[in-house]
Each structure stands twice: as structure tokens, then as C-alpha cells.
Amino acid sequence: MIRIINGQTYFTSKYPNIIIPEKPIPHLILKHIRYKPDQVLLVDGLTFKEYSSHFVADTIEKVACGLNKLNIKKGDVLGVILPNLPEYVPIFHGTLLMGGITSLVNPDYTIEELSHTLATVSPRYLAVTLAVYEKIKNDLKRVFPSVEKVILVDIAGQTLKEIDQLTLSSDGIVMSFNQLTNNNGKDYPIVRIDLTKDTAIIPFSSGTTGLFKGVCLSHYNLVSNTYQTQTIETSTYKKNDSVIGVLPFFHSFGLMLHIMLMVKQGYRIVTLPKFEPVRFLELIKKYKVAMSFIVPPIAIMFAKSPIVDKFDLSSLRTLFCGAAPLGSEIEDLIKERFKGRLVIKQGYGATELSPCCFVTPNGLVKSGSSGTLLPNLLAKIISSETGENLGMGEKGEICIKGPNVMLGYYNNEKATNEVIDKDGFLKTGDIGYVDEDGYFFIIDRSKELIKCKGFQVPPAELEALLLSHPKVADACVVGLSKGDMGEVPRGFVVIKQNESLTEKELLDWAHPKIANYKHFRGGIFFIPAIPKSATGKLLRKNLKDFNNLKL
């Protein structure tokens, strides 16, 4: 697990390297799902409509055929502005089958956010719901001058009649998904793909630390990470297991796990466009869901919400948490609540890594760890001050090298060179360490560390402390400038419903548990909700206005 190269320390996977198939991802998907043509592959969590593997495979090819009729060319971009719907699967893979590029964004984005993300990659086509179209139609030509066709996808609560009326009154720019797929699925060419050089998708970096950047991922990036993760993650699944697709498909974490890995493996995926606690728990009960990929806010629900006790969740065996670190306190609360029968696993990565690099292995689960290195990867941990490689147990910035590292940022060579070093290692910007068993632990983002009196204070550590208070529902910690001290921690807390708590009570409880330099000298503010991204990452930058308050 430790390799010394030219006197420098590197970390290798405990797993042997695997062979990465040299085929585009849609070819592999079609091959695998046609093995079990009659098996239910997708379920619409709103309508309960079921889709067989055979139907999904046929629809992928019908999307390819429909796009061919629209004269799609290799490298053309189809912007996907959709929630989690069954149609996401054929739209995604059908576009890639034609050599097109899918660019994925949050359907809740405003026009301004769309202009800073999707519009920058000049999409030729858009796939949207009626609600999204209503939001963008008046600004379509201004924000998306490159768009030639908008494909409307039906969602529960909208009628096909409404969509058909729009297609007739939109100067020919709008067509329905049904119109796109109204063909035999056979009339499309075989497009030659350069696996390592051709971009397959352009998701956008989270924007939690700055402006959005388009991340160019190749077919080989996607295939590599699907097979790397499969090596560890699917070995305990059973033949007819169901998973619930609540993680946003527009995010690389939800996309790879559901649209690629779970589809390829043939597990039944119940799609849910938006996380609603009651519906989410009802679907777990109804479809006997065995596995759920979640983010920390959902984990907090499993740990603390009384609503969980109202549902039969006996089918649930595993929770896999990613997108942001999950503190050991919340993990332990879930285990205690479910009397140890639930396996809590974590994964770690970044959009730039397609996205996974660590996954909790089967067997020994270490509370608070993000897991061990996936196959075919090399890691190093570097000092944020000297840039030198560090050893086991030493804390520094985690850097990853392997076949899942992105091609680069879209039209941004400068930003690419800032995060990928001369040896091909991606600098994650996250601070962590590796223990003697090869388990990695994430402490915090290097840019978010609070530097107080010469000490580095990880906000995540203080957030975990606040979350362990029985009356606290959610929490976020940021750094606040204060003269000679540098920065001091300031806390933001959401109190549990029907509970009361004062700042003094919370400070008196917290301060004896932490070193003096970690004390909340910036105070604690009680707010209605903690700002988070769609994938559950804390948006500390959104609390900037509070930081402008004078101490």
C-alpha cells in the first residue's frame, strides 16, 4: 500500500489493478442490460410505472436514431436540465451513442445560473421538463443562441396534451420526447469514439469555492470509474435488489452510481425527482429497497428524525454516503438507531475524478473514514506549506492519479494546470490522512480551514461537535477575520423542531469539549436552514454576509 518512488512516499490500492474495457460506455450498457430483457430496470417513483431492460435498451437506440434525424454531429452538446426521471437513462446513453456530449445541470438553476454554466458550452439541443421550459422560454434565444431543438420530457402532473400544444406553437424549436423516439431505433450510424480523448460529458464543478467550471470527462474516464467502483461496491448485492435514485443524476456522484453502475449491473432503480422524506421512506418500504446512495443531510434524517420510526425499513441493508464527508457522530447515531444491522459506507471523490477514488470496502468499516483507494489509482498526500510528500498518518492535501482523472476544464487551460500537476496528479483541495490499514480520512477542504492563532481548525470537526448536541438539527461553521488572531470560528445552527436552545447554553456545552483556540469566538447564530448544494455540500460562501458583521 506504500510505494517509495525516488525517495517520495505514495499510496497504492489494496486491490490489484483491473482491466478497463476499451469500449464507449453506452455500448457496455446496452450489452449488459440486454442479458436480462424482461427484468424491471427502472421505476418512476411518482407514477410507479415500470420499465423493463428490453424497453430501456430499445429507447436508448431510439434516442440515438431520433438525434440522427436531427443531424447531430460528433461533439455536439445536448444540455440535460432534468430531475431524476427514467428518461434520463436513454437520453444520456443515446446521446453518447451518437458521439454527442451531454452537459448536465441542476433543473432548479435560475436563468443567471444557466447562463454561467450550460450556456458556456454552446449546446445544440436541450432536454427539459415543461416547468424548466416555462422558466427559460422567454430568454431562450438570449441565453442559448446555439440551441436548435428543445426536447420536452413528461413528468407526473403534466399531460402529454400540454407538451403537444407547445410543440405546435414554438416555431418548430420544441419537440416532445415521444416524438424524438417515434422511430424503429435502427437508423443510426456507428460513430468512432477515441476513448481517451473524446469528451463524453461536461458536468460542472460544484461552485462551493468559486465560479462554476465545466469538467470534461472522457468515455474512458467514465468506463474506468464504473469498473473501479464495481470492484468494491457491488459484491454484496443480491440478484433482485432495488436501489432508490434520489441523488441528483446531474451530479457526477449520482450519475455514475445510478445511470452507469447500477444500470449496468441490472439492479432495479426507483427514481425520485426530488428528496421528500415521506415519499422517500414510502418508496423504500414499497419496493423493499436494499441500498440507498445518500448525502449527509439524508444521513442526518436517518440519525435524528422521528419520522423514520413510522416506516418499515427492514429491507434496507446499506447506506452509502458521499458528495461530502459524513462525521463519525452521525454515522454512530444511525448504527445505534438501527441496532447495528445497517452497514454505513462512505465514498469520496470529486467531479474531476469521474467522481470516485475512495470507497469503504466490505468487511472492516471504520467510522468516519471515506474508505480505501480504488484499483488502478495512486495517491499522495502533500504538505500545504512545502509541497513535499507526507507519510502515513500525516495530514495534508490529497492528490490522485489514475484513469478516472478528467481531461481538463472546458476551455480553461489555466485552471486545469492549477489542479493537475506535472506528474498527472489531481490536487483535490481536501485535507486528510491515511492510516496503517490504508483507510483515508477527510478532515476538510484546504481553502475552508480556519487559521486561528497559527493553528488550523477544520470546520467539519466543529460541525460534527454541534451536530452531536441532542437539540441541534443541523450546523455549519465558517471562519471570521479578527485582527491578530487571524480567524475565529463562527457557528450557524438549526434547532430541532419543538426544542429551545440559547447561544450561552450551547457555548457552555461545547467549549469544555474543545481546545481553547477552537472556541466559537465569532459566536453562534440560530437560523432556519443551512444553505446547501443539491448534493448536500455546505455552501459556506452563502453565509458570507454574516461574516461582515462586526464582532
Swiss-Prot record:
CoA binds at residues 274, 453-454. Carboxylate--CoA ligase that may use 4-coumarate as substrate. Follows a two-step reaction mechanism, wherein the carboxylate substrate first undergoes adenylation by ATP, followed by a thioesterification in the presence of CoA to yield the final CoA thioester. Keywords: ATP-binding, Ligase, Magnesium, Nucleotide-binding, Phenylpropanoid metabolism. SUPFAM superfamilies: Acetyl-CoA synthetase-like. (E)-4-coumaroyl-AMP binds at residues 253, 323, 346-347, 351, 447, 451. Both substrate-binding domains (SBD1 and SBD2) are involved in the substrate recognition, and are sufficient to confer the substrate specificity. It comes from the Eukaryota. Belongs to the ATP-dependent AMP-binding enzyme family. Residues 276-346 are annotated as: SBD1. ATP binds at residues 205-209, 213, 346-347, 351, 430, 445, 537. This is Probable 4-coumarate--CoA ligase 3. It catalyses: (E)-4-coumarate + ATP + CoA = (E)-4-coumaroyl-CoA + AMP + diphosphate; (E)-4-coumarate + ATP + H(+) = (E)-4-coumaroyl-AMP + diphosphate; (E)-4-coumaroyl-AMP + CoA = (E)-4-coumaroyl-CoA + AMP + H(+). It comes from Dictyostelium discoideum (Social amoeba). GO terms for molecular function: 4-coumarate-CoA ligase activity; ATP binding; CoA-ligase activity.
